[in-house]
Every structure is written in C-alpha cells, then in structure tokens.
Amino acid sequence: MDAMQKTIEYTSVSRIAGPLMVIDGIEGIAYGEIVDITTPNGDKRTGQVLEAREEIAVVQVFEGTSELNTSETKVRFTGDTAKIGVSYDMLGRIFNGAGKPLDGGPEIIAEKKLDINGYPLNPVSRNPPNAFVQTGISTIDGTNTLVRGQKIPIFSGSGLPHNKLATQIARQAKVRGEGEQFAVVFAAMGITGEESNYFMDEFKKTGALEKAVVFINLADDPAIERILTPRIALTTAEYLAYEKGMHVLVILTDLTNYCEALREIAAARNEVPGRRGYPGYMYTDLACLYERAGRVKGREGTVTQIPILTMPDDDITHPIPDLTGYITEGQIVLSRELNRKGIYPPVDILPSLSRLAGNGQGEGKTRDDHSKVISQAYAAYAEGRGLRDLVAVVGEEALTERDRSFLKFADAFENSIVTQGVDEDRSIEETLDYVWDLLTILPREELKRVSDELIEKYLPKK
C-alpha cells in the first residue's frame, strides 16, 4: 500500500454482522492489515482484515461493532500488520490481551516493534531441544522431563486444578547453570474475573512476577483479542529469548477458549465448518502457535512452551487435544480419579509422555540414574495399578506376596511422588531420591531395569 492509500477514508461499509463488517470498493488491501475505524460519534476503534478479495474486505473489529452503522462509519486501512512494542522492561508487568498495561503502570517504551505473527523460521536453522528445565514438580521433572525448546501440553478437564498447577510451574520453573537468565511469559485467554484476580494475586504475592510477563484476556473481551493474545505473548517470548539471550518458558491457558474464539469468528464469516463445528484450518492455526517454540542456531536463548487446555467432557479424542497431540512433543494428562482422591497435582503418568525426555536426562543434565530408575518406577507403578482391578474382583487375600509389594508400591508412589504441596519445590535430586526410597518396597530381584552398580550407589539399605 502506498502513502496515498494510507490517507484514504472509506465510508462504503455495506454490512455489519456480529464482530465483522464488510467494506466495498477498496483496492490494494492485504490480509492481516490493521484498520483504523471511526464510529458515528467520533470514537476510535481498531480492526484487522480477515479476508480481502476483488474490491471487498472483511474486517474484524477488536472492540465489537456496537454503535457502528453502514452510513456514518469511517474506515482507514493503515498498511501495517498487527505489531507489539517490546522491551526488557516488560518483565514484572501485567498486560491485557492486546498488550495494554493492566497493573496501573505506564505504557512500555518500545525498544522494537515486532509483528505478532513472528517470522518464518528455516527448519535447518533450528537446534534440537536440549537441556533440562526444572519445574519443581516430581511428575514432570522425573517422569515427563521438560527440555529447553520443547512444546508439551497439559490436558486437563473442567474443575481440575490446572490453574493452580500453572501458577506453581510459573513460580518454580528454572534452568540449571551458572549465569543462565530465565523468564516466564504467562498468557491466560477467555478466563473469568475471578480467575484473573487469582492469577494476578498469585504472581504478586509470591514474587514470581519479577521474572514474568503476564497477559490476561477475559471471557467478556472480544473474540479477536483472544486470537491475538497468544501471538503477542509468543512475540514477547521470542524477543526476550533471541534478542536478550534468555531462556523463556511460555505458559498458555486455556487453549480451548482460544479454539472456541476461532470457531466463533469462523461462524460469523459463514465458513464451512469442520469437525464439531471448528474451522478446517484449526490444525494449521494451532501449529502456527506451537511451532514458535524451539532453539535457534547462533542464539543463546530458547523458547519452551506449556500450553494448557481443558478437554470438553474429558474427551481426549476431541479435536482440540487430538490436533494438539499431532503437533506437540508429548502430553501431561490430569486425572479426575486422582483428583477425587485428594491428590495434587493429579498428574496421571501412564497416559502422559514427554517424547524428548531423554534429551534432558542423564549425567551433566540431571543425574546418571535418572532414566533407569524412572523406567523401573514407571513399570512397577503400571503393574500395581493393574493389580487394583484384580483386587476388586478376587480380593487382596488372593494375591501373592510379590503382587502385594507392587500394590503397595503403587499406593506409595501416588502418596509420596505424585502428591506434592502447592508450595513444595522439589529439586530433581530430591525426586530421584524419593523414587529410590520407594523401590525398597519391592523385592531386590524385581529391580530388573536398573544396573547393580546403580543399586549399590543409590538404593537405601534396609
């Protein structure tokens, strides 16, 4: 778009429907372009081009279309895409979903203005995810190890304590190493006012805000803002990682609300729906978010992602968790059964998986026994869980002494490894030591996945 076109104001709004308006008789307009809108009473609003064809543009109005009409509304196309001003001073601040301060502080003086959609990254310029990120939570650090540059979602359900877990991870997460800088970018989408107050209070009172940038989009905010929020958060993370050399953990919650916003906008545009009414491009859209995690050659910093989503009706085959699973490198699954038992965090390690766990385990990263002892504990816990079904049929008296030891191990594993205080920050060494303590419950001859050398070195003597 040339300078002349940027000054043209259009009054040719032909239709307004929901959050969308259609402008006729335009030319030289591009997809994603930002639009300045003047309402009939002179107020200013902002929009974005969602569709441009022939001489028609479909514009999503960020603040909604109330009070707009087809005769007096004025529109000016800016020629720019959606950008955010970023700065190191964003650390310790809370913003709304559009990047405006929510904490009463001043506007950020931008060091750079970056496109919120990021920039295409040549796969050849990526380094494989590597090195351990410690969350202080045993069921993540021990069994589903998080690695710098990885993307691993948390699959939750309505009413499960994923918000509490998200703030605990944000508070406790760290990288191990001298002089390594670490930050958290936290983005909440479509949350209630109560949840917003909870997040802000938790970040402020625990001191976690000092190393964090927080973005909050409320449920009554426009749907298009919900689409922008994770992109703004990821752009901020990329700036801190690749420009400032920091290791950044991005926590996105709740991606289900994000996908509902995608569906709402697609319906307003009369698009042909895909599975369960979601747009057919939802997979591509989610990939545009998740694939912004990683490590880049020649840059010190990394971007690691933990997206959190609530599975509708606890259905892991629902399109949102299903498509997420295709893109990401594993999943951490929260269990309603464990939650009913009063276990926090209710992480079910059997369906959970970190495909890159091996990249962050072992000597020089965690400890030399990590992968072997966790493999042994995982196998023993799985066998103990299976025996519970048998006990429900034949009773515990019918079990052999060996089977009873595995049953006891499964109960102890849930009570001492899975169960953890909301303020309990465990180092990986503490987690592994707890696991070795539990392995004393099993007969020595059943420890087939750990070497005699490791047993002599780490297994406590009875």
From Swiss-Prot:
Cellular localisation: Cell membrane
Listed SUPFAM superfamilies: C-terminal domain of alpha and beta subunits of F1 ATP synthase (SSF47917), P-loop containing nucleoside triphosphate hydrolases (SSF52540)
Any one biological process term the GO annotation gives: proton motive force-driven plasma membrane ATP synthesis
Any Pfam family the entry gives: ATP-synt_ab
Paired cysteines (S-S): none
UniProt entry keywords in alphabetical sequence: ATP synthesis, Cell membrane, Hydrogen ion transport, Ion transport, Membrane, Transport
Entry GO MF terms: ATP binding; proton-transporting ATP synthase activity, rotational mechanism
Main localization (coarse): membrane
Cellular compartments per GO CC: plasma membrane
InterPro entries: ATP-synt_VA_C (IPR055190), ATPase_a/bsu_AS (IPR020003), ATPase_F1/V1/A1_a/bsu_N (IPR004100), ATPase_F1/V1/A1_a/bsu_nucl-bd (IPR000194), P-loop_NTPase (IPR027417), V-ATPase_su_B/beta (IPR022879)
Its membrane topology: Peripheral membrane protein
Assigned protein family: Belongs to the ATPase alpha/beta chains family.
The protein's assembly and partners: Has multiple subunits with at least A(3), B(3), C, D, E, F, H, I and proteolipid K(x).
Function text: Component of the A-type ATP synthase that produces ATP from ADP in the presence of a proton gradient across the membrane. The B chain is a regulatory subunit.
Entry protein name: A-type ATP synthase subunit B
Species, as recorded: Methanococcus maripaludis (strain C7 / ATCC BAA-1331)
